[in-house]
């Protein structure tokens, strides 16, 4: 019986925008009546999700406000609520969300905005605003609530009272969820924040990654930092691995890969690997969330990419879904955010031009189950390649091998039987461009290996 011996991803210049692999579309919503932003013609921004009373909900921001969808039944997804923003229109680029103790917190960075708090505890029957005011702050770029301590962290904050003040970051105690109390602020800019049990990772823009102990929120203690790393740019966002030993972060610069950092010793944070979509030399990861052994990334221009991170030193793509059809990568369009916590059949994605996506990533998660057993020593290089590839099966006794190349749509592009331990193939005449999947078949027991160079 013929079995897959090797399955790998091979990049052949030049890379193009992709369609999908191992990810299926469940639902898409886009309201053409909503205004686009003056910058980049974006209509939508952040995505969030929550479960309450056995119902699942998706939250997406737009230039006009907040849209909440009931996604409980994949066959009948619909918009359940719309919350108008205090500020609306073409100037609105950023909204952000987090839920805590039956409340959804809604913020915005532009215009005469407010913080809004929505009581969601009685859904599906009803939900209503219980707070809509600029008394705490008028604007903020984003928020993160550490639910273990009831502390809300906010980046790029503008307050109006008692006098206008711009803060790089502010921290609020949610002991009373309807009355956030400021307990700390700093002037140094922080773009994004991740906190787990009061250990707080600050993606500090041009100042790299910083880590603090906020167990006493009014007096944080510095624990460590990382600067001067390869591909350092505008440190934008990040997420901690479930085991707490590694942290993945992205710099919002064209062509810069994500960095996987070992954070077991915060006095010596080390980048142990890089990961990228590989779609274009200018691809940019925007936001990322980790659930289990999988990293979910919303990429500008490239859509959703899912990576297996079970080995932090060898991060592998296992699925993707492109939501932005144009092939340009020079701007900041396409996917904004991702939310995977409603389950593999309800992964939420927001695209700035085309709206809300509900995606089924079951195949992407199952894909890696067949990759755990593999034959070591097989090499396919160079990768990326410009036409010629070399295949070295090493010292493995596997007999004749058949090579097959497929494009992202699953169409067979090329096949050949290999009889030598090392083979060089010139594929230039095929004029293959973009992401290509290479499979090597043997006649022996199933052995599967993915190679990433």
Give residue ranges: language-model regions:
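C-terminal outer-membrane/trafficking sorting elements
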Residues: 373-381, 385-453
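Bacterial Sec-dependent N-terminal signal peptides
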Residues: 1-20, 411, 437
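Selective for proline/serine-rich intrinsically disordered segments
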Residues: 1, 175-178, 218, 380-382, ...
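N-terminal regions of proteins, emphasizing targeting and processing segments when present
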Residues: 8-10, 365, 374
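Compositionally biased, intrinsically disordered low-complexity segments enriched
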Residues: 7, 11-13, 69, 118, ...
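Feature marking well-ordered beta-strand scaffolds used for ligand recognition
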Residues: 17-366
